[in-house]
């Protein structure tokens, strides 16, 4: 793998560049993570089994999409590829620090500008991706209520059922979610898709976001994540509101949007997350 990475990075360096440092980083819960120094420049490397190359390719595509918006900072992508055994993603190395109040407010403003970027008539994305390690379908759909009910809540419930986890009648739940959102047809916004404190940090040049699960959806979905994480700086919400105030009805829709993340946690981690997801589902749709 390291030879394949060296070959790709050599194309971006002067002759004679080579690996000078290679340290595995702690906290790689999903993929192995490394700090690599090559040709005097630092890189962040994610790697995993070769079969997971599509996940890294999708992540690179999402980071490049967010970068094109010129509204939020994301790590620059330098290479994505594989050898016979491993796949990898090579990005800019940005040692993360927690957001302070000022930079949290600034990030909130940047997220608001991201949500205002470009005009897209439909909900979805040109390709499927992943929420954490869970596959996320993104087939284009014109009705927001249909998209969210079927491709977010219905999808999670089907995945749960495949693992023997049942939260109620899937068809009835999907219909109930769709009915509650039927009168809400927002302008599609490009979302980060997994906006929590673990995917936001302070870098050398200000706040940045990473590990996206992008799609075009209701901007309220990104903001609905914030109350689920008490450690998330509240200034993110304040900064967002200063640029693009949320519409009436946001607080009523918020519990419905939170179901997507709560169901995903229940599938991934089980235990108390199953109880939390069931309680949230019952309360949101009562």
UniProtKB/Swiss-Prot annotation:
Keyword ATP-binding attributed: yes
InterPro entries with a match to the protein in the record: Fructo-/Ketosamine-3-kinase, Kinase-like_dom_sf
Protein keywords: ATP-binding, Kinase, Nucleotide-binding, Transferase
Residues engaged in binding ATP: 92-94
Pfam families attached to this UniProt entry: Fructosamin_kin
Molecular function in Gene Ontology: ATP binding; kinase activity
Active site: 194
Top class in the EC scheme: transferase
Enzyme Commission no: 2.7.1.-
Family designation: Belongs to the fructosamine kinase family.
PANTHER family linked to this entry: FRUCTOSAMINE 3 KINASE-RELATED PROTEIN, PROTEIN-RIBULOSAMINE 3-KINASE
Function: Ketoamine kinase that phosphorylates ketoamines on the third carbon of the sugar moiety to generate ketoamine 3-phosphate.
Protein name: Probable ketoamine kinase EAE_16955
Species of origin: Klebsiella aerogenes (strain ATCC 13048 / DSM 30053 / CCUG 1429 / JCM 1235 / KCTC 2190 / NBRC 13534 / NCIMB 10102 / NCTC 10006 / CDC 819-56)
């Amino acid at each position: 793998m390291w030879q394949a990475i060296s070959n790709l990075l050599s194309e971006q360096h002067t002759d004679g560049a080579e690996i000078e440092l290679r340290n595995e980083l702690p906290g790689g819960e999903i993929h192995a993570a490394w700090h690599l120094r090559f040709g005097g420049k630092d890189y962040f490397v994610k790697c995993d089994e070769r079969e997971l190359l599509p996940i890294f390719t999708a992540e690179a595509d999402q980071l490049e999409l967010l970068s094109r918006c010129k509204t939020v900072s994301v790590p620059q992508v330098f290479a994505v590829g594989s050898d016979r055994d491993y796949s990898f993603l090579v990005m800019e190395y940005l040692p993360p620090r927690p957001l302070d109040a000022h930079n949290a407010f600034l990030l909130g403003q940047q997220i608001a500008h991201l949500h205002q970027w470009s005009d897209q008539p439909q909900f979805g994305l040109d390709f499927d991706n992943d929420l954490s390690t869970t596959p996320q379908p993104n087939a284009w759909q014109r009705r927001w209520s249909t998209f969210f009910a079927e491709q977010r809540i219905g999808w999670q419930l089907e995945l749960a059922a495949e693992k023997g986890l049942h939260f109620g009648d899937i068809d009835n739940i999907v219909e109930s979610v769709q009915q509650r959102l039927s009168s809400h047809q927002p302008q599609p916004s490009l979302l980060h898709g997994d906006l929590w404190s673990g995917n936001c940090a302070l870098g050398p040049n200000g706040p940045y976001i990473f590990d996206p699960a992008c799609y075009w959806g209701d901007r309220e979905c990104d903001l609905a994540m914030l109350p689920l994480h008490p450690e998330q700086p509240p200034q993110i919400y304040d900064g967002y509101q200063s640029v693009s105030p949320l519409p009436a009805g946001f607080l009523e829709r918020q519990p419905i949007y939170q179901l997507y993340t709560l169901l995903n946690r229940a599938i991934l981690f089980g235990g108390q997350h199953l109880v939390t997801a069931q309680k949230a589902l019952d309360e949101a749709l009562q």
